[in-house]
């Protein structure tokens, strides 16, 4: 419970920027609470006036009723509207904070968590969290003020009789506490299963071509049915707890009301109480049932929100990528791996005691079988992964001493899996730090990547929207857009991770010529299975199981007739 309180206090801290609006919420619901108490008071005056036959007083009551309803509506509008304003702004600000954290988390987080579960946190969980911090607060303020107002009126009218209500409060407290624990557990399960649902949807949509080609529609439908069914079952269990708790609380309140009515009818209790006072008291006691019911019902929203808050705050409290570097050098492209080891979870070593020096402007090709550690090696250069032991130097500076954004601004990378965004061709080439690049530079980069001609044949040329992942383009065209992006960056270090593997022979020929020129005076690391693309590299490094087993020029390695020779023969046969 102490931990829950801390979480709720943290939730409420998000309301600080909106304290002025929150004050209007308090005023609005305060007016509404006053009208609830006034209903009982008005009944007292009406009944007493009727008994006394006071015609002058009776003439005012219609106007008072209209005023009462008007102010009640005004209070509800103020409270409801400004609560909604806070709620929507909270969703906006928390989502911004989560997204800012997500894009700064280490790459390992994305390897350990599915995209479906991640998106569920930013969409579904934030909505649930807002229910705790704003919607629940709305009910607690509105019905809390009504409850306090009615209890105050009851105590003022007959404090001895009102104490009967407090006798039943511990029973209500026990019911709410037990329901809270159960609903918290179920809320976490509902959120997890919602992540599973999102995961299945994103996988099937992203891999729709594979689903169709392997006739996997029925299989994916079953997967979606199972994950949705799990979510449904846990949701229904929450409904059972919620709907069982509410009638039990109402039963306890009915018992309290019955006791009050029974005692109120005793002559010794009635005393000199007027009919108006008696009816007003019973009315106020009856009006108390609804806000108390609402306050117990809000517990379900509160528990869902707190469960979501644990999930959201857990993400927000994760450490961002380490960026303790303070140096911002203009790199020349000198790279040195000094006894570098990269170890994954489970003590699996992707790189083992690796030593390699690359001179500025040198083109080094790294080849090897799948799983040899080639991609892991280049990931270290942009700190997508961190060195487990040993040291990595750029221009004789330890890589961790270089400020992270400065480092990445000076490394251009064409990934094995091309990533394009649902934006224009121009925006995809001039992406990120390249935004605002001159049109002439963008066109020059596209021409160097032999992309300009096909871009000009698109419906709107450089303004053509590519669609999700650029699926409107062929594999070779997507690859050339990515290469144009890397060329435009004009970084001192260029990494080509199997960059020409998706190109047809003609495109590969032209792009290889473009790269031969682009690689001048630039340190280039090329990873490729198609060995024909790296024959002109200054040096070829052959890796196996995270270690260098051979290195030299193309001709030198062929003469050795070792591992590279075997890879070359296999490529030639293919």
Curated annotation (Swiss-Prot):
It is found in: Cell inner membrane. This is ATP-dependent lipid A-core flippase. It catalyses: ATP + H2O + lipid A-core oligosaccharideSide 1 = ADP + phosphate + lipid A-core oligosaccharideSide 2. ATP binds at residues 368-375. It is a multi-pass membrane protein. One of its GO terms (molecular function) is ATP binding. Residues 23-304 form the ABC transmembrane type-1 domain. The lineage of its organism: Bacteria, Pseudomonadati, Pseudomonadota, Gammaproteobacteria, Moraxellales. Its EC number is 7.5.2.6. One of its GO terms (cellular component) is plasma membrane. In MsbA the ATP-binding domain (NBD) and the transmembrane domain (TMD) are fused. Belongs to the ABC transporter superfamily. Lipid exporter (TC 3.A.1.106) family. Keywords: ATP-binding, Cell inner membrane, Cell membrane, Lipid transport, Membrane, Nucleotide-binding, Translocase, Transmembrane, Transmembrane helix, Transport. Homodimer. Involved in lipopolysaccharide (LPS) biosynthesis. Translocates lipid A-core from the inner to the outer leaflet of the inner membrane. Transmembrane domains (TMD) form a pore in the inner membrane and the ATP-binding domain (NBD) is responsible for energy generation. InterPro entries: AAA+_ATPase, ABC1_TM_dom, ABC1_TM_sf, ABC_transporter-like_ATP-bd, ABC_transporter-like_CS, ABC_transpr_lipidA, P-loop_NTPase, Type_1_exporter. The chain crosses the membrane at residues 11-31, 60-80, 156-176, 244-264. NCBIfam families: MsbA_lipidA. PROSITE patterns: ABC_TM1F, ABC_TRANSPORTER_1, ABC_TRANSPORTER_2, MSBA.
